[in-house]
A protein has these predicted regions:
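Conserved catalytic core of sirtuin-type NAD+-dependent deacylases
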Residues: 2-281
Length: 281
């Protein structure tokens, strides 16, 4: 069974790269930035992996950063743990209020989303695997056929007992009408956002697609992810093992920096366009 996990599996391989490059925000191109650009320009089958850091500029806080949701309120992490969600009605009620008040509903795609959507037009972006549940890639113009929402989407609701699935707004209307822990109208089961919580199985088809694209890519570009949640983080060493270049762009160090060919650290809305500007022309 494939579970979302905060821990690294004991048998997961790690491949150390002999060259680890870092950069900070600068007005002048660095050798590391130039190298990343040249690799992207030469690559023909690029896998992009995005995380919460890409959406912070859109007003959606990340989880583990210095101002992350779970950093500021560790108890909030219980809302994303399937064990608590299934066993505690109060957790479910809090989770529904959190969904109702989510900044996702007012958020617009940021520059990073838009740059990646434009980059897709080059025909060299094979697959975009996102850990984000906000749907901003599609709103920015990324093709839904190329986007794998590996942790699901907050924009839909699914029953945990049957096949019932509807847009989130349908259930939020029931919340506005006074329901606190809405049940499935078809079977009476527990409803939940169509996202993957800790301890919950990933969609096997989505993970299989992501792994296949990883083995097929010649460059993996990771953007805005701490690369600490498995099995998604495990895509990086898989790509490395098959010979792909690894470029990481993030606002802080990640768990996979030692595996990368280049690690570019800085404001994503400045660094990412710098990396992709020539490649999108």
């Amino acid at each position: 069974m494939l579970l979302a996990s905060k821990e690294k599996p004991g048998l997961a391989p790690v491949f150390l790269c002999s060259l680890i490059q870092t950069m900070t925000e600068s007005d002048h191109p660095t050798p590391e930035l130039q190298a990343a650009k040249s690799w992207l320009d030469a690559a023909q089958r690029i896998l992009v992996l995005t995380g919460a850091g890409l959406s912070t500029a859109s007003g959606i806080p990340d989880f583990r950063g210095p101002q992350g949701v779970w950093t500021r309120d560790p108890d909030a992490e219980k809302l994303s743990d399937i064990r608590y969600y299934l066993s505690d009605p109060n957790i479910r009620k809090k989770a529904w209020l959190s969904r109702r008040d989510s900044p996702v509903w007012q958020a617009q795609p940021g520059l990073g989303h838009e740059v990646l959507a434009r980059f897709e037009e080059t025909g060299r972006l094979d697959t975009l695997v996102t850990q984000n549940i906000d749907g901003l890639h599609q709103l920015a113009g990324s093709s839904p056929d190329r986007v794998i929402e590996i942790h699901g989407t907050i924009r839909e609701v699914a029953c945990l007992a049957c096949a019932y699935r509807v847009p989130m707004q349908t259930v939020l209307e029931r919340l506005a009408a006074g329901e606190q822990d809405p049940e499935c109208p078809d079977c009476g089961g527990i409803l939940k956002s169509a996202t993957i919580s800790f301890g919950q199985s990933l969609v096997a088809h989505d993970l299989a697609r992501a792994e296949a694209a990883t083995r097929h890519c010649d460059l993996l570009l990771a953007v805005g992810s701490t690369l600490s949640v498995y099995p998604v983080a495990g895509l990086v060493p898989i790509a490395k093992e098959t010979g792909a270049r690894i470029v990481i762009v993030n606002g802080e160090p990640t768990a996979m920096d030692d595996t990368a060919d280049a690690v570019l650290v800085g404001d994503l809305n400045k660094v990412l366009p710098s990396v992709l500007d020539e490649a999108t022309r």
